[in-house]
């Protein structure tokens, strides 16, 4: 397994690839993303351990979307079976993915605990769904400080786990080592990941502007009564957010594909879900 250093413009290619693969199988990819989110939501409802259980499933859910994207790009229809890909490749892989999930849950909950030192747990209660976000809460300086600290700490956690599911699944890297290789790959390719992040920010911003323009246009021409604009706009925004989130998760496999060599052992369970071919040098 060799780490690849890619040019910054590759980040834009990753964004385009995520959108492209979604366009190839829009219904399948959207349905799979919805099912992963629904499974995590159901897990979060388990008394006492629900939030931690849902966080534990996130690396497996990310891997499922990576495999689904790879299959869609290769002309195969991604079925709901990919949702269980983390649990179908042998006992050792299963244990490693569960360990990875436990590490992620511990890291995330640790960040929330640290933020609670600043505001007495107010941000934690809002973020984990235990309290409503009111204007008074949002304007609370302690709440804002806790929010910014949590966001700052989540960035390195995200980099640690960005490539980890793929490394465990396709290369058989142990969980702790996968975290090290993941953050090294992200840091060494910081230019590409910066362009990648900015690209997705632009996509989300453009989507929001288009929804606003569409809602205003419908109201002006009389198709949509003015009183229904907020509700309709909110519904469209939710649907658009789901679509763009699906595109984003569909693009993750391309960041992994270009940063590491493909699996070295064809025919193994992890190699059966083959990665798409790498981005050609000079393409964007």
What are these language model-derived features?
Residues 1-284:
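Hydrophobic alpha-helical membrane segments
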């Amino acid at each position: 397994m060799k780490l690849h250093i890619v040019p910054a413009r590759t980040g834009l290619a990753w964004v385009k690839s995520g959108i492209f693969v979604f366009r190839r199988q829009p219904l399948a990819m959207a349905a799979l993303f919805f099912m992963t989110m629904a499974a995590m939501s159901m897990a979060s409802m388990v008394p006492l351990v629900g939030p931690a259980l849902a966080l534990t499933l996130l690396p497996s859910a990310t891997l499922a979307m990576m495999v689904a994207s790879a299959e869609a790009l290769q002309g195969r229809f991604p079925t709901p079976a990919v949702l269980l890909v983390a649990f179908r490749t042998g006992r050792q892989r299963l244990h490693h993915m569960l360990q990875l999930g436990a590490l992620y849950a511990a890291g995330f909950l640790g960040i929330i605990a640290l933020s609670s030192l600043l505001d007495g747990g107010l941000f934690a209660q809002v973020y984990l769904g235990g309290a409503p976000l009111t204007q008074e809460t949002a304007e609370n300086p302690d709440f804002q400080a806790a929010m910014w600290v949590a966001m700052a700490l989540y960035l390195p956690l995200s980099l640690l786990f960005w490539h980890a599911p793929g490394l465990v699944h396709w290369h058989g890297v142990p969980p702790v080592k996968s975290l090290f290789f993941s953050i090294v790959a992200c840091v060494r390719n910081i230019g590409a990941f910066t362009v990648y992040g900015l690209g997705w920010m632009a996509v989300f911003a453009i989507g929001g502007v288009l929804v606003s323009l569409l809602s205003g246009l419908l109201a002006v021409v009389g198709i949509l009564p003015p009183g229904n604009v907020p509700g309709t706009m909110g519904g469209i925004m939710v649907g658009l957010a789901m679509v763009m989130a699906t595109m984003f998760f569909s693009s993750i496999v391309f960041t992994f594909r270009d940063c590491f060599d493909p699996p070295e052992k064809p025919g193994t369970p992890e190699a059966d879900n083959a990665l798409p071919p790498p981005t050609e040098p000079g393409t964007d």
